[in-house]
Amino acid sequence: MKKVFSVEEIKEIESREFRKRGGDSFSLMVNAGVNCAKKIIKLVKKKPIIIVCGPGNNGGDGFIIGNYLHEKEYKVEVFCLQKKYYKGDALKAFKKLKIKTQNISKFKARKNSVIIDCIFGTGLNKPISGTLKSVILRMNKLNKIISIDIPSGINGDTGKILGCAVKAHTTLALHAKKIGHTLNPGKKFSRKIIVVDIGISKKFNYK
């Protein structure tokens, strides 16, 4: 069974799982968010949490994580884009969010908080610039950052930095490691990698 996958292979594995679920992709996002939140609880105990959400499904995972931690009585702040930038499952997760959000441009680093990086996942294919680059540079001033799936700004296939990248303390890889986790600088930026089971059948890992 393979243990490290390309971005395209992960997309195919997810597509097979969606078909098995009758096209229900949102339930997989919920699994990913909830299971990541459970890992976060084990890693950080009761520290304040700041979740930074980008425009895609990685941001959607962040909204699910935020709700779960909020229900467990964690102090949670969510910084994200405006609603118009979300679609599909990410928009669905945004609408279900029970926490008041703040605009991502207003993000401020706080030394006593743990940052959850949900800005970009493995689907990023162009350099980060503008506001999101500024946010990442501010995030990197902190020691404790947990990235969801891959540090934002790291190419999932090459490990290269796309404009800038989050320097994670821990990376929660969804379902399996990606090639970008194993190649520098992606390997260095991912630091400690924990694979999180998100409910995808392991039989799809076989070619």
What are these model-predicted stretches?
Residues 38-119, 127-148:
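Nucleotide and nucleotide-moiety/phosphate-recognizing core
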Residues 10, 36, 76-78, 116, ...:
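Hydrophobic aliphatic residue packing
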Residues 15, 19, 52, 80, ...:
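A near-ubiquitous, low-amplitude feature marking generic local secondary-structure context
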Residues 5-8, 23-35, 60, 88, ...:
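Conserved active-site and cofactor/substrate-binding residues in soluble primary-metabolism enzymes
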Residues 2-5, 112-207:
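YjeF_N-associated NAD(P)HX repair module
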Residues 1-46, 201-207:
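Positively charged, low-complexity intrinsically disordered leader regions
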Residues 31-34, 57, 136-137, 192-193:
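Short, surface-exposed, charged/polar-biased interaction segments
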